[in-house]
Design a protein with these regions (language model features):
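Glycine-rich, low-complexity intrinsically disordered segments
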Residues: 1-182
Length: 182
């Protein structure tokens, strides 16, 4: 006989919003002290089937992925901020074409247009701060980076945070071994 509890949720703990970490494969040594990240929205377009009574929406065939925005604490040496800043400037090359050439040259000195992209991972952690799932983003690239506002009139020390907005081709959610899609 079938077990009536086989399809029940085994872990009754709720997922807390404080358990996550973000990494970029392009900058493995740069720590992103992320204090805010979200799995971007995912939407499916619809097509309208005309009818003499009421038009009927039917599922479309193209998914739309929202932007990935991470908010992170800026380290004292500004390494994480400058990594995003220089990556963005390298893609947009506002001063010289050499900036783009530098951005698209890999560590072996070979030009590779794919160097403008990086894969990234958002690790979702449980209440014991162990991986529950890994959201893998393919072909990330930055499109916006917030400013840092210096203010000598501040009476309290508020550490800088910055937001980086990135686009990507697709994301997938994997289990903790990063091999099986959930």
């Amino acid at each position: 006989m079938a077990d009536p509890f086989a399809n029940q949720i085994q872990n009754r703990n709720f997922l807390a919003p404080v358990g996550f970490k973000f990494t970029l494969s392009k900058y493995p040594k740069v720590a992103f002290f992320s204090n805010s990240a979200r799995i971007p929205e995912l939407s499916l377009g619809t097509a309208t089937q005309p009818s003499y009574l009421k038009d009927i929406d039917i599922p479309g065939e193209k998914l739309t992925y929202g932007d990935l925005t991470i908010r992170f604490l800026v380290d004292e040496n500004m390494q994480n901020y400058m990594a995003m800043h220089n990556w963005l400037k390298g893609i947009g090359f506002p001063e010289t074409p050499q900036q783009f050439a530098d951005q698209t040259t890999n560590v072996d000195g070979v030009r590779d247009p794919l160097e403008v992209f990086s894969d990234g991972s958002l690790h979702i952690l449980n209440s014991n701060f162990q991986d529950v799932a890994i959201v893998k983003f393919n072909d990330l690239f930055p499109v916006a980076l917030t400013s840092l506002e210096f203010d000598a009139t501040e009476t309290d020390i508020n550490y800088f945070t910055a937001e980086a907005t990135m686009r990507y081709t697709v994301y997938n959610i994997f289990d903790t071994d990063a091999r099986t899609r959930l």
